[in-house]
Amino acid sequence: MSVALAGNPASTSTQYEPLRVMIVDDSVVIRGLISRWIEAEPDMVVAASLRTGLDAVNQVERIKPDVAVLDIEMPELDGISALPKLLAKKRDLIIIMASTLTRRNAEISFKALSLGAADYIPKPESTREASAADIFKHDLLQKIRHLGGKVRRKASAASSTAAPALMREPAAPAHSVASQAALVKRPFGVTAPRVLLIGSSTGGPQALMSLVSEIGSVIDHYPVLITQHMPPTFTTILAEHLMRSARRPAHEGVDGEVVKSGQIYLAPGGRHMRVVRQGGQAVIALDDGPPVNFCKPAVDPLFNSAIDVWQSGILAVVLTGMGSDGMRGGKDIVAAGGSVIAQDEASSVVWGMPGAAANAGICAAVLPLNQIGPKLVRLFSGDRS
């Protein structure tokens, strides 16, 4: 079966094969729920619905899935044990770990990311709660579509010389464009930066751990505030990983806490993190309001609120992630005289958020992840080149 690319006038004649999704979960309820959601989508199909990790390992070569949704807790062979075996048999398999929100499962999910899983998704405690099930559905389908789509685009590019009649490429994210050389870049702000703000989503944990390990001199002298799209418990674990990577203090922001240099503050899962000025000091204000850009915590609330505190002294970085969160806040930062750096497409797991910022023309630089850290060190040391 092939499906025409929808919503893109430039590619109305292009077709692609639906993403093949393998569901691996010992819960028949979860398998049935995910199967129904996937089968209702025009750009994906259920390649297999399996009960154990052992079933998945034994059948993955025959099934040939593009994406696997892999439960952590299963009989015979659990998700974390099955993960490396699946990747050994199919190196390009996109694996999304699924687990309930416990500390143990959060820790296992982080281990899975280090072993090659592409992403994770928290399963609702009960699928009977409509709002929780709707959020799970929205997030899961988005992850399958965007993560699977990137692999298809890479495969399509690698085989483009063969000029196949049937394109194996799903609709690209809205901001995944052609040559980055064509992106309009603006000069860095003239004011020396006094705070570092970072926003990230899919692929963010690994990117953040890599980045903070390279900017110790920045953290020592300036506050660093981060919003990563993540649920509660997961952000607690991420803060611990950031502290180990940076070898500097890192923790979830606390409502009313004074922001100080030498600290990394991470937005806690399920709450927006803003900054306000009180008595001449920058103070964290946690917000339990509705999601922004479908996310909570979201990047835009952090970016926007920081302007009232640091004005033109803001340097913001938008890392890998789906959607466009951070773009509007980045626009306001630039309008106030600050600067924005975006991660480039090649080094991003998903070039949604950084792509939105780059294509909006608000970035002073669009860089590979391994060049962002050294650039930040130079900028905070006064080198504006």
UniProtKB/Swiss-Prot annotation:
Write down the CDD domains for this protein, in alphabetical order.
CheB_Rec, REC_CheB-like
- The answer on whether this UniProt entry bears the keyword Transferase reads no
Residues with PTM 4-aspartylphosphate: D71
* Molecular function per GO: phosphorelay response regulator activity; protein-glutamate methylesterase activity; protein-glutamine glutaminase activity
Q: Where is the active site?
A: S201, H229, D325
Query: Which residues does the UniProt record annotate as the domain Response regulatory?
Result: 20-138
User: Which residue pairs form cystines in this protein?
Assistant: none
Query: In its UniProt entry, what is this protein called?
Result: Protein-glutamate methylesterase/protein-glutamine glutaminase
What species was this sequence derived from?
Rhodopseudomonas palustris (strain BisB5)
